[in-house]
Swiss-Prot record:
Belongs to the pyruvate, phosphate/water dikinase regulatory protein family. PDRP subfamily. GO terms for molecular function: ADP binding; ATP binding; phosphotransferase activity, phosphate group as acceptor; protein serine/threonine kinase activity. Bifunctional serine/threonine kinase and phosphorylase involved in the regulation of the pyruvate, phosphate dikinase (PPDK) by catalyzing its phosphorylation/dephosphorylation. This is Putative pyruvate, phosphate dikinase regulatory protein. It comes from Trichlorobacter lovleyi (strain ATCC BAA-1151 / DSM 17278 / SZ). Keywords: Kinase, Nucleotide-binding, Serine/threonine-protein kinase, Transferase. It catalyses: N(tele)-phospho-L-histidyl/L-threonyl-[pyruvate, phosphate dikinase] + ADP = N(tele)-phospho-L-histidyl/O-phospho-L-threonyl-[pyruvate, phosphate dikinase] + AMP + H(+); N(tele)-phospho-L-histidyl/O-phospho-L-threonyl-[pyruvate, phosphate dikinase] + phosphate + H(+) = N(tele)-phospho-L-histidyl/L-threonyl-[pyruvate, phosphate dikinase] + diphosphate.
Length: 269
């Protein structure tokens, strides 16, 4: 079995993913990837190159310290080892393009990568728990948004998810009991959304028009909407520990900022 060694002054996770992506173009090749992480000095570089040479492997490396990258290149050539520098050419091009030098701080790429996957995990969670789906998973949410239909629950949930928060949202419908799971949630995680009846009628009317449905639909009837909002307020009063915000005149960004600001004890932007 052939071996590809991934050498890095950080975790090597990002470089390994790049290698695996490239390997996917070669079908079912019998290749093992071995990670050599946290290589931070020339002695460790020499030991790593010796190991790869003994196995007749391919060396792929990402080292932000240019002196270490040069050392790997030099020692690999001395051993007749096939080695590929993933990072240095890009750092050089970016340095020329931006007119500045790289920080040469190991681990920054891994941190960016980690943040990205954390956001993706949050987005996936939020999609699965949109509009009352998967109520059994509410307890795993960072935030739970509650409100009547068209009160910005979904766009607000997705905006917060893209900041890395796992968000579930639950619709309030007069005449239908909210899910029991909602009562078991830590009150400090729940946000109740309010909106003026007039604005809600405008939003719902626009939706009916876009969907080609009859304007006589009670969904956008002013009196029915007023009843829904009254029910909503009454329900919120039974949960004094919830954060209640009015989204009537706010953009999604403004509502999200208010939520994070007022829950600063739990979340930091």
């Amino acid at each position: 079995m052939k071996k590809i060694y991934v050498l890095s002054d950080s975790t090597g996770e990002t470089a390994e993913r790049v290698v695996r992506a490239a390997l996917s173009q070669f079908g079912g090749s019998d290749v093992r990837i071995v990670r050599l992480a946290k290589v931070c000095n020339q002695q460790e570089v020499q030991q790593a190159v010796a190991t790869v040479t003994a196995d007749e492997g391919l060396l792929v490396y990402t080292l932000v310290d240019s002196s270490l990258a040069v050392a790997v290149h030099t020692i690999a050539e001395e051993h007749g080892l096939m080695a590929f520098d993933l990072l240095s050419p890009l750092l050089h091009s970016l340095s020329v393009f931006l007119g500045t030098v790289a920080q040469s701080t190991p681990g920054l790429l891994h941190q960016i990568d980690t943040d990205y996957f954390r956001r993706m995990e949050a987005v996936n969670f939020t999609v699965k728990h949109d509009d009352g789906q998967e109520n059994r998973g509410l307890v795993k949410a960072d935030l739970v948004l509650v409100g009547v239909s068209r009160s910005s629950k979904t766009p607000l949930s997705m905006y917060l998810a893209n900041k890395g928060y796992k968000v579930a949202n639950v619709p309030l419908v007069k005449g239908i009991d909210p899910p029991e799971e909602l009562e078991a949630i830590d009150p400090s995680k729940v946000v109740g959304l309010l909106i003026s009846p007039k604005r809600l009628v405008e939003i719902r009317t626009s939706r009916l028009v876009n969907m080609g449905q009859s304007m006589k639909n009670s969904y956008a009837d002013y009196e029915k909407v007023e009843d829904e909002i009254a029910f909503c307020r009454q329900y919120y009063r039974r949960h004094p520990g919830w954060l209640i915000i009015d989204v009537t005149c706010k953009s999604v960004e403004e509502s999200a900022s208010e939520i994070l600001r007022r829950l600063v004890g739990q979340f930091a932007e």
